[in-house]
Amino acid sequence: MTDLRQLQYFIACVETGSFSEAARILYTTQSSVSKAMKAMEESMGLLLFERMPKGIVPTAQGRKVYRYTCRILKEVEALNHISASGETKWLRVSTNPSSWFATQFVSFYNQNYEKNYHCQVYTSGVRTVMERVRDYKDDVGFIYLMEHREQGLQYELGKNHMEFVPLHQVDAMLYLGEQHPDYGDSREVPSLSSLRFIQNYQDEFLNDDTWEGEDGSLLSEQMDVSVVTNSDYIMQAMLQNTDLGNISPDGLSHSDKFINHDTMQLENQEQSVQFICIFRNDQKMERLPKKFLTFIKNYVME
């Protein structure tokens, strides 16, 4: 029979792709991890891993077991937080990197400080946010989605018992760094071919392959991208202290009360960008995630 220790070892093996690396983070030996995984496979009658020359890869059955295991360990964690005073309420959220979202999360926490909510917030790209919600690691995920990618996203979500609700529609914007000579002069958009850019890491659901420049060619063919990052802190610092530009959904401007970005709307944009919330539909959303979703929805609709 599979026990909790084996499940914890299994999660570590899947996420590290190595028995030895899993042993390192679990403070045990590689032999112990390997034996535990072998025993788990025999107990379940399944091959959970393909043993490769350089590591391990979960099989299709292994990936399915991984999702169930994440859910089990989440429930175990919830049980461990039950005390005599009642059950601790947890909010688990993942999101694309966003300064305005961070500001609103702080506001939500402060407004509900006396309720003693416990929170977990994770920032990453669209694919990782989807996987975390799928694997029961987070209650809800907030992402930006190109309009023409909606059908592909719906397919991905549907096969994993998930769906999304649109919250806001925005345009693609050019953000100029404060050291650029045209900063503060928003009368016309400077030539994109003359700029150097800092851009977020992209994925298949949020990319710039339909955004056109002033001559009708694709922006991706014009842009000189000098810096690529997944950190909103790096993005903010570079825009404040360099002449780099950034093309993103109109999201940074939500934080203009705190950081004064010079923004210009791009021309020739036929595709809009949606800000959406994704969640699992095979279980009822708990009250706290629903409360946070309503809070964010009210903010973006202001």
Segments the model singles out, each with a brief description of its role:
Residues S43-M44, V65-E87:
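Alpha-helical linker/hinge and terminal dimerization helices associated
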Residues D262-E302:
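A late-sequence structural motif
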Residues E41-P58:
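A short LG(V/I)-centered, amphipathic sequence patch enriched
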Residues R134-K137, E204-T263:
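Hydrophobic hinge/microswitch elements
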Residues E156-Y201:
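Flexible hinge/capping segments at coil-to-helix
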Residues A102-F105, D182-L219, E286:
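Secondary-structure junction motif
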Residues M1-Q30, A36, V65:
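N-terminal short secondary-structure element
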Residues T88-L153:
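Central regulatory/effector-binding core of bacterial HTH transcription factors
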